[in-house]
Amino acid sequence: MLLIPAIDLKEGRCVRLKQGLMEEATVFSDSPADTALHWFEQGARRLHLVDLNGAFAGVPQNLPAIKDILAAVAKDIPVQLGGGMRDLKTIGQYLDLGLNDVIIGTAAVKNPDLVREACKAFPGRIIVGLDAKDGMAAIDGWATVTGHHVIDLAKRFEDDGVNSIIYTDIGRDGMMSGVNIDATVKLAQSVRIPVIASGGLTGLDDIPALCAAEKHGVAGAITGRAIYEGSIDFAQAQQLADSLD
């Protein structure tokens, strides 16, 4: 079970949001590159970046911070980025910087053809991020809940060639209320590609249940607020997950 630290970028700084609200941002660091190095030194084997300004603006907005992070750690561990990835040109430009994968979120739901085209242009390097409230996909920084069920979308994107799905339960992200294991497993069982859980990890007690879900296709979990606020020691959590595999 891979635990993946999240680095959320807002105006060049590392922050965390509560339930996707930009006005509910807590600043954790003015140096995202130092944050990336810290998590690498704590045993992270992959990093998850989100350009929050990009997610709201529709185009990435934190290029200097992203470049600094890649310069610091990309030679050692893969780095993935989401937020503002809404056309092939942007996706290509950011992959060329040294990112391992790009995550398409809102654009995947609004413009499914983009996913198909991106998978053809950049095979093996496209992840789709599906955010859900009560099983229905949410878009535009969680501002709009659609009529599309995430399982139907996941099956479609699997056929298009995405390498994995990141699944966020909106009701739990940044609220420290536990991962929605049941919903994540249900999604993972509906596809053959790996599903990464995101949102709600609260403590070491969550790790055994996550690891038990691995046999159903849940390959990892993204963690943010818990490791920044100290309710989870990242190194200890990854060691525990490794011991349970």
Swiss-Prot record:
Where does this protein act, in terms of pathway? Answer: Amino-acid biosynthesis; L-histidine biosynthesis; L-histidine from 5-phospho-alpha-D-ribose 1-diphosphate: step 4/9
Q: Which GO terms describe its cellular component?
A: cytoplasm
Name of the molecule in the record: 1-(5-phosphoribosyl)-5-[(5-phosphoribosylamino)methylideneamino] imidazole-4-carboxamide isomerase
Q: Supply the SUPFAM superfamilies for this chain.
A: Ribulose-phoshate binding barrel (SSF51366)
- EC numbers on record: 5.3.1.16
Q: Any idea which GO molecular function terms this record carries?
A: 1-(5-phosphoribosyl)-5-[(5-phosphoribosylamino)methylideneamino]imidazole-4-carboxamide isomerase activity
Q: Where do the catalytic residues lie? A: 8 (proton acceptor), 131 (proton donor)
Q: Where in the cell is it found?
A: Cytoplasm
- Gene Ontology biological-process entries: L-histidine biosynthetic process; L-tryptophan biosynthetic process
Keywords annotated in UniProt: Amino-acid biosynthesis, Cytoplasm, Histidine biosynthesis, Isomerase
Q: Which InterPro entries match?
A: Aldolase_TIM, His_biosynth, HisA_bact_arch, Isoase_HisA-like, Isoase_HisA-like_bact, RibuloseP-bd_barrel
Q: Which domain of life is it from?
A: Bacteria
